[in-house]
């Protein structure tokens, strides 16, 4: 059985909310993730979001560890505000905790 990777959100500052700059950052993360897979373990860029009005970029990365995510962003030359673990809740699913609170 294959174990699931942990999801992380990488928060970055994108000066001026530049889509060109953000696209370059995303390309860098994808290339760095591919390079690290061959050497260090499992890491996968899932998706990225730019919030131009706030000059913020958010990258969802699945990996075996937060340290691996940090190495990927460093290799990509991305200046990171923070990296945090994230939990995905799929549409139509109700968490066990929510069900317990409803009774």
Predicted regions and their residues:
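An amphipathic, aromatic/His-enriched active-site/gating alpha helix that lines ligand/cofactor pockets
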Residues: 37, 62-89
């Amino acid at each position: 059985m294959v174990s699931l990777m942990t999801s992380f959100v990488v928060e970055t500052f994108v000066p001026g909310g530049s889509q060109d700059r953000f696209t370059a950052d995303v390309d860098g993360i994808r290339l760095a993730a591919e390079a690290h897979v061959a050497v260090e373990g499992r890491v996968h860029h899932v998706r990225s979001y730019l919030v131009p009005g706030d000059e913020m970029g958010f990258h969802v990365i699945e990996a075996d560890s937060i340290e691996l995510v940090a190495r990927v962003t460093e290799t990509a030359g991305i200046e990171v505000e923070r990296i945090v673990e994230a939990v995905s809740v799929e549409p139509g699913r109700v968490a066990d905790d929510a069900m317990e609170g409803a009774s």
